[in-house]
UniProtKB/Swiss-Prot annotation:
UniProt keyword Acetylation, yes or no: yes
Role summary: Cytosolic metallopeptidase that catalyzes the removal of unsubstituted N-terminal hydrophobic amino acids from various peptides. The presence of Zn(2+) ions is essential for the peptidase activity, and the association with other cofactors can modulate the substrate spectificity of the enzyme. For instance, in the presence of Mn(2+), it displays a specific Cys-Gly hydrolyzing activity of Cys-Gly-S-conjugates. Involved in the metabolism of glutathione and in the degradation of glutathione S-conjugates, which may play a role in the control of the cell redox status.
Needed cofactors: Zn(2+); Mn(2+)
Residues bound to Zn(2+) 2: K282, D287, D305, E366
Comment on bound cofactor: Binds two metal ions per subunit. Two metal binding sites with different affinities are located in the enzyme active site and can be occupied in vitro by different metals: site 1 is occupied by Zn(2+), Mn(2+), Mg(2+) or Co(2+), while the tight binding site 2 can be occupied by only Zn(2+) or Co(2+). One Zn(2+) ion is tightly bound to site 2 and essential for enzyme activity in vivo, while site 1 can be occupied by different metals to give different enzymatic activities. Mn(2+) is required for Cys-Gly hydrolysis activity.
Name this polypeptide is given: Cytosol aminopeptidase
Length: 519
């Protein structure tokens, strides 16, 4: 008999089917170490029967229609993201999870600003793979569900959980494509998702483990193993001083951990002299707030205040693995923001690399201080584009929550490229204003050229972006405030609770499309 998760009435119905085992019993009968995830679509019309995917239909034929029979009596039709698990259907796959994919016709939703079909696949496959993981089965084959890249992303993202420091860990499940078609798209999805998982790991690791130096070493290890077309420079404090990065150093001086300026190069273009794209990421490996100290509640989350550095570095590692034919430079000023006798004090004035002076009225607005020097340095590479990412402001979380990354940019062309990439990945972005209205609030300063918090509490994300703009002269620059998407509670179904690693896949997709446009 089949072992089904059914109510009593349905179990009676199954017995009436007189279903027999499809293979001979015995020690060699079934490989209990492999599961299968198959997709089924919702009905387009009420009178229709739900359709399996191609892979689901083929498997149903392989078991003489039994999958359809038991699915029909096991409960109502599966809604998007829901699962049902069956056992004993085929000796190659003793455990089969059927997942609901929603409507087959689902496409780009202009109201939601994403591809609904791809998001449904990611969520459904993640749910199915977790069912296999809960059964402690170490291998799963996944139906491409009509989009092998989205299926791979759902599997790899959905199975990931940070448990590096625990003695008891979840079973590691290896996911691979069911069938031989679409292998290229599947592998691309694995790379995209693995990039986001790298960012999640960097962000989740406790701050005593993930120091500025350790962060740089992990990125170096991952980048060097990704491609031989790479260079990594872990710049010490003496180099930072030589570069006259006084704004960065003012934040770092409060901690016993030495600051590091991480500079990574991926040289994928056949033309070595081709100008690069430059990514800059905020790298505060722990943010106490400094002298303007934060409240104790949830301060532990500030181990992920280097999320900007984590996402941009992970995106570049992924670009290297994809062997994209472009040049990219990644810059990450790395330090802690701690209170001490050496720390910044409210009212201090510091000097940035471009000579501008900054009045530090709040030491908890430190991310913009380290980014100011990094953005100045970014211009030395004659870049095609400058994009920075930072968990910069709580105001961004209040404005957009976890729904989208806020993007402030001086280039509509760049905005459109990021927006298009985000529709594909489902990791959305939303354009925010860079009005002169906000610039006036940060340059109206009593003691220096600019103030690090501005005149008013209102529009904190906008005034922070206006502050950064004071250190940018490039006509194609975008600032991504990722504070609202730093963590995941239950908003993204294919990510477990914890640090989200967003918007890594959107940055990878942006680079992927840019490389195709440049070819």
């Amino acid at each position: 008999m089949f072992l089904l998760p059914l109510p009593a009435a349905a179990r009676v119905a199954v017995r009436h089917l007189s279903v027999k085992r499809l293979w001979a019993p015995g020690p060699a009968a079934a490989d209990m170490t492999k599961g299968l995830v198959l997709g089924i679509y919702s009905k387009e019309k009420e009178e229709d029967e739900p359709q399996f995917t191609s892979a689901g239909e083929n498997f149903n034929k392989l078991v003489s229609g039994k999958l359809r029979e038991i699915l029909n009596i096991s409960g109502p039709p599966l809604k998007a993201g829901k699962t049902r698990t069956f056992y004993g259907l085929h000796e190659d796959f003793p455990s089969v999870v059927v997942v609901g994919l929603g409507k087959k016709t689902a496409g780009i939703d202009e109201q939601e600003n994403w591809h609904e079909g791809k998001e449904n696949i990611r969520a459904a496959v993640a749910a199915g793979c977790r069912q296999i993981q809960d059964l402690e089965i170490p291998s799963v084959e996944v139906d491409p569900c009509g989009d092998a890249q989205a299926a791979a992303e759902g599997a790899v993202l959905g199975l990931y959980e940070y448990d590096d420091l625990k003695q008891k860990r979840k079973v590691v499940v290896s996911a691979k494509l069911h069938g031989s078609e679409d292998q290229e798209a599947w592998q691309r999805g694995v790379l995209f998702a693995s990039g986001q998982n790298l960012a999640r790991r960097l962000m989740e690791t406790p701050a005593n483990e993930m120091t500025p130096t350790k962060f740089a070493e992990i990125v170096e290890e991952n980048l060097k193993s990704a491609s031989i077309k790479t260079d990594v420079f872990i710049r010490p404090k003496s180099w930072i001083e030589e570069q006259e990065m006084g704004s960065f150093l003012s934040v770092a001086k409060g901690s016993e951990e030495p600051p590091v300026f991480l500079e990574i190069h991926y040289k994928g273009s056949p033309n070595a002299s081709e100008p690069p794209l430059v990514f800059v990421g905020k790298g505060i490996t722990f943010d106490s707030g400094g002298i303007s100290i934060k409240a104790a509640a949830n301060m532990d989350l500030m181990r992920a205040d280097m999320g900007g550095a984590a996402t941009i570095c992970s995106a570049i590692v992924s670009a290297a693995k994809l062997d994209l034919p472009i040049n990219i430079v990644g810059l990450a000023p790395l330090c802690e923001n701690m209170p001490s006798g050496k720390a910044n004090k409210p009212g201090d004035v510091v000097r940035a690399r471009n000579g501008k002076t900054i009045q530090v009225d709040n030491t908890d607005a430190e991310g913009r201080l380290i980014l100011a020097d990094a953005l100045c340095y970014a211009h030395t590479f004659n870049p095609k584009v400058i994009i920075n990412a930072a968990t910069l402001t709580g105001a961004m979380d209040i404005a957009l929550g976890s729904g989208a990354t806020g993007v402030f940019t001086n280039s509509s062309w760049l905005w459109n490229k990021l927006f298009e990439a985000s529709i594909e990945t489902g990791d959305r972005v939303w354009r925010m204003p860079l009005f002169e209205h906000y610039t006036r609030q940060v340059i109206d300063c009593q003691l220096a050229d600019v103030n690090n918090i501005g005149k008013y509490r209102s529009a904190g994300a906008c005034t922070a972006a206006a502050f950064l703009k004071e250190f940018v002269t490039h006509p194609k620059w975008a600032h991504l405030d990722i504070a609202g998407v730093m963590t995941n509670k239950d908003e993204v179904p294919y990510l477990r609770k914890g640090m989200a690693g967003r918007p890594t896949r959107t940055l990878i997709e942006f680079l992927f499309r840019f490389s195709q446009d440049s070819a």
